[in-house]
Amino acid sequence: MKKSGLLVIVMACAAAGLYSQTFTYIGSAKCAICHKTETQGRQYPIWQGTKHSQSFAALSSPQAAEYAKQANVQNPTENPDCLKCHAPLCEKSAELKAEGVSCEVCHGPGSDYKKLNVMKDVALAKQNGLIVYDSQDAIKKQCLTCHANAHGKSFDFAASFEKIKHNKPAQ
């Protein structure tokens, strides 16, 4: 009886570990290793060519200074209201802060899905933290967390999506 009770406790602890797994952010440079070629969909170079990759740097621009002045913000590069959209992972590390709106902002922390054998199996990658959107509406909902009337500007999802969309890698 004692052995079976111990086995139940060990199994319960192991199962709890599976469901309380925490993933860590690794930075977009790790994503670039695989996601830069035409074969893989060029996700990284596409991201580099968008305002997302420059969103934190934009907080140091004259335009940001004007927005900050209007909003009574001293330093937009340190203001939580600015950072929540311009550098959503800022509290994780200085590197992630500088990346602005990086791969992992939309696709989740890559520590456990970054390996090729995991990425080749979408279900396994999802189990390991990858966020994959199942529809354009789901993508739009994610975008609107920051782009809904940002700075008083309307958001044209269709036009904006054309600038950032990237192909899924070949399976």
Predicted segments — roles?
Residues 4-14:
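Sec-dependent N-terminal signal peptides
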Residues 18-98, 104, 110-137, 157-171:
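Sequence context of c-type cytochrome heme-c attachment sites
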Residues 141:
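Cys/His-rich zinc-coordinating modules
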Residues 145-159:
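Short, exposed beta-strand-loop hairpins at the edges of beta-sheets
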